[in-house]
């Protein structure tokens, strides 16, 4: 089912009309196809809100569990033509299954990522749609939100750099490393959204990830007071990034 690495016995695949679901039975043992529909949670009074972006992320509170439900949507010009549909090749290459399995592997390795709960694709002819459910992290907010609220300490910037380096040392190339996909809590830094991410040998792409993050930081702070993001802050992040984790290979 994984194609590249072993999944634990708690991971199951179930067929649904026109597609399949992949899920962790320890987190979603009674998974239903309806769980991927926001209106289902709304009808039960368990939809807590939503975060808008390229694709809405819905916040769900199910019993004692807090989850994020996301429907895959295109960005840019392609969104005008296909919105939420992607070219079908095979099950393994569907965006929800690929992201779920990579996130599963990262979480199992102890990296600061949300635990994957379930993923689904539905195939129709030569295209498919997809959805994913992940754990909602107990965070203060995204890096963007925190910067809008006030300046961050140099210790926080160093921690952000260290976090990114942990992923890069293990060859995790984040396809969209930006200020929205870095989450902060009182004690931890997390990365989210591993759609289209790849495992690669560390190389020039690592610098490309950092350049992308820098552009994002400049974009989200350009209208804010200048002390919200300074050169000293960026150098603090780079100082943290230079502190290698020493781990260079993900466990199988």
What are these regions (language model features)?
Residues 33-141, 165, 169:
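Conserved ATP-binding subdomain of kinase catalytic cores across diverse folds
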Residues 71, 136, 177, 194-196:
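Generic detector of well-ordered alpha-helical packing
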Residues 142-151:
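AlphaC helix of the protein kinase catalytic domain
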Residues 155-163:
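Conserved alphaE helix
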Residues 173:
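Conserved catalytic-core element of eukaryotic-like protein kinases
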Residues 177-184:
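Hydrophobic residue at the +6 position relative to the catalytic HRD Asp in the kinase catalytic loop
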Residues 190-252:
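C-lobe/activation-segment region of protein kinase-like
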């Amino acid at each position: 089912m994984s194609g590249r690495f072993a999944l634990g016995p708690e991971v199951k695949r179930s067929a649904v009309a026109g597609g399949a679901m992949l899920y962790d039975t320890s987190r979603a043992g009674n998974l239903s196809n309806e769980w991927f529909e926001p209106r289902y949670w709304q009808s039960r009074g368990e939809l807590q809100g939503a975060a808008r972006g390229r694709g809405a992320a819905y916040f769900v509170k199910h019993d004692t569990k807090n989850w994020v439900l996301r429907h895959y949507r295109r960005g840019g010009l392609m969104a005008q033509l296909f919105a939420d549909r992607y070219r079908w090749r095979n099950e393994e290459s569907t965006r929800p299954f690929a992201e779920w399995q990579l996130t599963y592997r990262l979480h199992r390795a102890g990296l600061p990522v949300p635990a994957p709960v379930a993923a689904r694709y539905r195939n129709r002819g030569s295209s498919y749609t997809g959805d994913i459910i992940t754990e909602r992290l107990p965070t203060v907010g995204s890096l963007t939100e925190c910067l809008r609220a006030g300046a961050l300490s140099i210790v926080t910037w160093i921690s952000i750099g260290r976090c990114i380096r942990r992923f890069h040392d293990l060859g995790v190339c984040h396809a969209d490393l930006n200020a929205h996909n870095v989450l902060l809590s009182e004690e931890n830094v997390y990365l989210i959204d591993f759609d289209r991410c790849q495992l690669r040998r560390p190389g020039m792409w690592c610098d490309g990830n950092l350049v992308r993050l820098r552009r994002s930081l400049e974009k989200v702070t350009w209208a804010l007071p200048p002390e919200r993001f300074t050169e000293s802050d960026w150098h603090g992040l780079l100082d943290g990034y230079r502190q290698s984790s020493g781990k260079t290979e993900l466990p199988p």
